[in-house]
Amino acid sequence: MKHTIAVLVENKPGVLARVAGLFRRRGFNIESLTVGTTERDDLSRMTIVVEGDDKVVEQVIKQLNKLIETIKVSEITESSVERELCLIRVHAPPEKRGEIVELTNIFRARIVDVSRDSFIIEVTGDEDKVSAFIDLMRQYGIKELARTGKVAMVRGNKK
């Protein structure tokens, strides 16, 4: 089962390497990892998706809490907002452009670059939406793909 863990850490050099090292030493595989600054310049937020049972996730959380730079660790189990972003360079010959534009609009994606023979399309949404769009674009020929990991927040007024 996939679990999403939010980690608030000090925004300092080497923190990401220590977190990744913790996973490596314990033999845990990171499915997805995103890191960025928060509303405070001195803090970063990591969103980590890990595959495993509840016992594995419990151990990961305990180990993360032991790191000096860790401020807060929480598993996102409640109702949450989760998003990914994907940029896809897709082959777009003149006779297929209309179809590609139509699918892009249906998914509320955006064409962010146009060249003679391709589009770069930006799609955001939950994991299933992004995956479904990628699957539809395969028939046109994906030339390049860059996909972020998941970012997530618990719904409501929680902090």
Swiss-Prot record:
Q: Does the keyword Amino-acid biosynthesis apply?
A: yes
Q: Which GO terms describe its cellular component?
A: cytosol
Q: Please list the GO terms describing molecular function.
A: acetolactate synthase activity; acetolactate synthase regulator activity
Residues covered by the ACT domain = 4-78
Q: Reaction catalysed?
A: 2 pyruvate + H(+) = (2S)-2-acetolactate + CO2
Pathways per UniProt? Amino-acid biosynthesis; L-isoleucine biosynthesis; L-isoleucine from 2-oxobutanoate: step 1/4; Amino-acid biosynthesis; L-valine biosynthesis; L-valine from pyruvate: step 1/4
Xref: InterPro entries: Acetalactate_synth_ssu, Acetolactate_synth/TF_NikR_C, Acetolactate_synth_ssu_C, ACT-like_dom_sf, ACT_dom, AHAS_ACT, AHAS_small-like_ACT
Its keywords, alphabetically, are: Amino-acid biosynthesis, Branched-chain amino acid biosynthesis, Transferase
Any single biological process term in GO: L-valine biosynthetic process
Family annotation (Pfam families): ACT_AHAS_ss, ALS_ss_C
Q: What is its EC number?
A: 2.2.1.6
Annotated PANTHER family: ACETOLACTATE SYNTHASE SMALL SUBUNIT, ACETOLACTATE SYNTHASE SMALL SUBUNIT 1, CHLOROPLASTIC
Q: Subunit structure of this entry?
A: Dimer of large and small chains.
Q: Which family does it belong to?
A: Belongs to the acetolactate synthase small subunit family.
Q: What is this protein called?
A: Probable acetolactate synthase small subunit
Which taxonomic lineage does the organism of this UniProt entry have?
A: Archaea, Methanobacteriati, Methanobacteriota, Archaeoglobi, Archaeoglobales
